[in-house]
Amino acid sequence: MSARNILVINCGSSSIKFALVNEAQEQFPLSGLAERLGSPEAILHWQQGDERDSLVIAGADHRLALSHLLPIVQRVAAGELHGIGHRVVHGGEYFSGASRLDAVSLQAIRQVAPLAPLHNPANLLGIEAAMKLFPTLTQVAVFDTAFHQSLPEHAYRYAVPEALYREHGVRRYGFHGTSHRYVSQKAAQMAGLPADASSWLVAHLGNGCSTCAVENGHSRDTSMGLTPLEGLVMGTRSGDVDPNLHSHLARTLGWSLEQIDSMLNKDSGLLGLSGLSNDMRSLEQAREQGHAGATLAIEVFCYRLAKSLAAMSCALRRLDGLIFTGGIGENSALIRSKTLEHLGLLGFALDPAANARCVRGVGGPIQAAHGPLVLVVPTNEERQIALDTLALLD
């Protein structure tokens, strides 16, 4: 049987990220982005090998954008497209793994949409459009939350009245599960350990950030909670704050819940601390030039990250190593170094030369000779979604 092709789709409210994944090839035969959907500036960008191209699709919605994408995908796949994998942010307690898309699974995704109002409705737009355009293809949903359904109850429950959990699903769900699962499996391979008999601390650091404790291939705790706002300092998200901050701002400043939610999700984190940018690359450059806000943002980011990793270690009975992944985790030697400075009590130490080498897609071990294993592992959520989709084709 020839190698199979899976189209992976990740839909936002006005965008579609996509990748054509061939199970026998490391590089994607095709990848790209449709952005500014629903506006006169809507455009489709794609890359095939070293070639890049664009197509103006003014006013296109998700379905029309996918209809423009279809012939490009079929040409690159030589007419051999075997399935479509959709990233879905929230699966609630319904999904502990990937699921074929049908009327039942679609209804479940709709039911948990209030838990991810910024994400699930957009994911559904792409799913519904793709199912109309590709009615004969198997389509699969892969959930950010599914990997964390293995959390024990003492890790996922909030200390709030029981009825809020039983009747309204108020609990910790966690996110970035596809990435945490992929890199922990890769780390086990790199270390020569079985994935189902190894334990890892994982730091997924991008514009969104989370940590995870992975034991024997299962998530045991993670820093994000009911929503992706809980936990670490992120690009524009505050992470953990005093839960009374909402009522304090409402009483003292007269802010509405919508204003407070917007501030915590869009104006906080690295951007709020620095007053400059949510981009770690810009902040590192500004820090070099003496910018006080950028310096503070980096210090807070690294301290809070180290604190979270130390807390995650409580969920493990042994520790085989620490993994850095995501755009920041894979590319910022400074963030890795400053974070591990706070974790000396756990024995972590870096080899500066190895740490400096692991950027721009280069992974590998970066620990000092005497310290516990520390790995930079480039994530590949698209490939993991494709693998999960292929598993449901068999």
UniProtKB/Swiss-Prot annotation:
This protein's UniProt keywords: ATP-binding, Cytoplasm, Kinase, Magnesium, Metal-binding, Nucleotide-binding, Transferase
This protein's pathway: Metabolic intermediate biosynthesis; acetyl-CoA biosynthesis; acetyl-CoA from acetate: step 1/2
EC number per UniProt: 2.7.2.1
Active-site feature positions: D144 (proton donor/acceptor)
Site positions for Transition state stabilizer: H176, R237
Subcellular location(s) of the protein: Cytoplasm
Catalytic activity annotation: acetate + ATP = acetyl phosphate + ADP
Main location: cytoplasm
InterPro entries, A to Z: Ac/propionate_kinase (IPR004372), Aliphatic_acid_kin_short-chain (IPR000890), Aliphatic_acid_kinase_CS (IPR023865), ATPase_NBD (IPR043129)
Bilayer-spanning residue ranges: none
Binding residue positions for Mg(2+): N10, E381
Co-factor binding details: Mg(2+). Can also accept Mn(2+).
Cofactor dependence: Mg(2+); Mn(2+)
Record-level GO BP terms: acetate metabolic process; acetyl-CoA biosynthetic process
S-S bridge residues: none
MF-aspect GO terms: acetate kinase activity; ATP binding; magnesium ion binding
Binding site for ATP: K17, H204, L205, G206, N207, G208, D279, M280, R281, G327, I328, G329, E330, N331
NCBIfam families: ackA
Family of the protein in this entry: Belongs to the acetokinase family.
Subunit structure of this chain's protein: Homodimer.
Function: Catalyzes the formation of acetyl phosphate from acetate and ATP. Can also catalyze the reverse reaction.
Record protein name field: Acetate kinase
